[in-house]
Amino acid sequence: MARKAPDQDAGEALRRFKSDLKAGTLGNFYIISGEEAFLRSHYVDLITKKIADGPAGEFNCHRFSADDCTPQALADAIDAMPMMAERTLVRVDDVDLFKQPEGAREQYAAIFSDLPDYCCVLFVYDTVEFKINGTMKKLAAAIREHAQILTFGKQSERDLCAWITRHFRAHDKMVTDELCQYLIFRTDGLMTTLAGEIDKIAAYQQGPAITRGAIDAVVIPALSA
């Protein structure tokens, strides 16, 4: 059987994740990365609300950064039983697992290989790039076997046009596909940037139809535009 390309695997991982999120059957280990910060933030928020949004939400949600995350601290948080809820959430931001000392890497590998069903561990990467280092075999194997890796990259022009149209519609504005493409060209094409520009354009534009003049008036062109 031919081996699947990385983008196929990534697409399948995202489809599975979205299906599990909708069904309320989230797994217990996710790694979220990619340059599209808007989507990263969106889905991290949805996971958090799904798992730790009850009356004891703060108690059931544990968060670490590179400054305070250690194997022992992570293990203690994972071992903490949920209060007035079915599950707990442990979020770790921007910790490069493969740059940890060998002893810590082995401890992390052991932790990831024995996660309880009541806990969802979420590693989120924003300022640090996530990349598996295959030379560190134990940790790499544990992540590949147990983690669902979700990469939110730059969206296609087609998907962005549909998304831009929906967001203008929320402002009671109409926009053509041609102007959606122009707005993408004028910006860096990232949804975080586009969301802010859409709000500005909608506030500036008089009448229901977005015009090129309104885009030119308020959008500061990206250096690459």
Spans of features found by a protein language model:
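Conserved beta/loop motifs at nucleotide-recognition and modification sites
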Residues: 1-225
